[in-house]
Regions:
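Short loop segments and helix-boundary regions at transmembrane helix junctions
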Residues: 42-46, 102-160, 193, 255-256, ...
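Alpha-helical transmembrane segments within multi-pass membrane transporters and channels
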Residues: 74-129, 281
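Transmembrane alpha-helical segments in multi-pass inner-membrane proteins
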Residues: 242-315
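Membrane-interfacial amphipathic/re-entrant helices at transmembrane-helix boundaries
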Residues: 1-33, 46, 60, 71-90
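Hydrophobic alpha-helical segments embedded in the membrane of multi-pass proteins
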Residues: 27-36, 52-57, 101-104, 219, ...
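Transmembrane helix-bundle core of multi-pass membrane transporters
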Residues: 128-192, 251, 298-307, 336-344
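Helix-loop-helix "hairpin" substructures at the membrane interface of multi-pass membrane proteins
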Residues: 168-248, 277
Length: 344
């Protein structure tokens, strides 16, 4: 195996391939998470619960996939790429259903009860973290199979002979990443090119004017929040299933990425194209968290060999970016304001 060796750094082509794959996965996951915030907030609902959506989507989808995989342990079907990806699609379907139901917790309390949306979103994040933690604890106490999808790893559509770079890129490729890329294109077109997208944006900018031409503002807000929650949940599910994160734990999964995509959404100025570029920027630095500790040998100073430093880097950059660029961001004018038809 050929190695690139530079002053204590030993990097194999396989590792370079996994870096690029991680970059793509994080890019897709973060973009979908950012789109989740965009759809919700462009309709007029502040969605702080993106982290909860990503966490719940990853947990529910993984739970289904791991149970199906364990039930079929030892079966030749688990060596079939198409069948394994069918299991991933089942998990994705469950993820969508759970996220769709979860979205109504935020939208109902925000629209019907007119509660403070920031507080509601924060509470929902805490609720989901507690549900996932308790669910995982009960799962372990019941002596059920471990929650992981490691039985699906290395089930490749095609293995490249003597081409470690491409094997690294495609070693854990599954259909969810393809679905994610297609979904990014579809959601971009919906927001920018369709009547539904125009109506959603109108409800976030000037709900009174939208109502005056017959648009049902609250209905559009329910739809925007539902699309946003599902999009973020799929992003979380893709990140966990495409990257080799192993057994589920609250901190080794997607916990915390929702707050990063909030920053991505703000930096993207609630526009699909800008959110995509911002997501790719942060995806690069997030993927470095794993890559650096794999690539560097022990000859490099401990500071540069610290995974914690590189895992912290995207969040540090998010804070700095918000400090310098947040003044240029323009949120929807009616964001966070419950619509009262009588006050029109």
């Amino acid at each position: 195996m050929n190695l690139l060796i530079l002053e204590g750094i030993s990097i194999s082509p396989y590792v370079w391939g996994t870096l690029i794959f991680s970059f793509i996965v994080f890019g897709v996951g973060f973009t979908l998470g950012g789109f989740g915030g965009m759809f919700s907030e462009c309709s007029g609902i502040i969605n702080i619960a993106l982290d909860g959506s990503m966490l719940l989507g990853a947990f529910s989808g993984l739970l289904v996939c791991s149970q199906i995989g364990d039930a079929l342990k030892g079966n030749e079907l688990l060596n079939n790429w198409a069948f394994v990806n069918f299991i991933y699609l089942i998990g994705l379907f469950v993820c969508v259903i759970v996220a769709f139901a979860f979205s109504f917790l935020l939208s109902f309390v925000s629209i019907r009860l007119k509660a403070d949306q920031t507080i509601v979103g924060t509470a929902l994040n805490s609720l989901v973290a507690a549900i996932v933690l308790i669910g995982n604890t009960i799962h372990r106490a019941a002596d059920l199979p471990e929650m992981d999808v490691s039985m699906f790893y290395n089930v490749m559509l095609y293995k490249f002979e003597d081409m470690d770079f491409f094997n690294g890129m495609f070693s854990n490729l599954n259909i969810t990443i393809i679905v994610g890329i297609v979904l990014i294109v579809v959601l971009t077109l919906i927001m920018n090119k369709t009547r539904l997208g125009l109506r959603i944006r109108a409800c976030g900018e000037n709900p009174a004017a939208a109502d005056s031409v017959g648009i049902k503002v609250n209905k559009m807000r329910y739809i925007g929040t539902a699309i946003g929650s599902v999009s973020a949940a799929i992003g979380g599910y893709i990140i966990f299933t495409c990257l080799r994160l192993g057994e589920w734990t609250l901190t080794s999964g997607v916990f915390g990425y929702g707050f990063l995509v909030l920053a991505i959404e703000i930096l993207g100025n609630w526009k699909a194209k800008n959110i995509t570029f911002a997501a790719l920027f942060f995806a690069l630095f997030t993927s470095l968290g794993t890559f650096m500790t794999t690539a560097f040998s022990g000859g490099v100073k401990a500071f540069y060999n610290s995974k914690a430093f590189y895992c912290m880097l995207p969040y540090l950059l998010a804070v700095l970016s918000l400090i310098f660029f947040s003044k240029k961001s323009h949120a929807p004018k009616a964001e966070g304001i419950p619509y009262d038809k009588s006050a029109r």
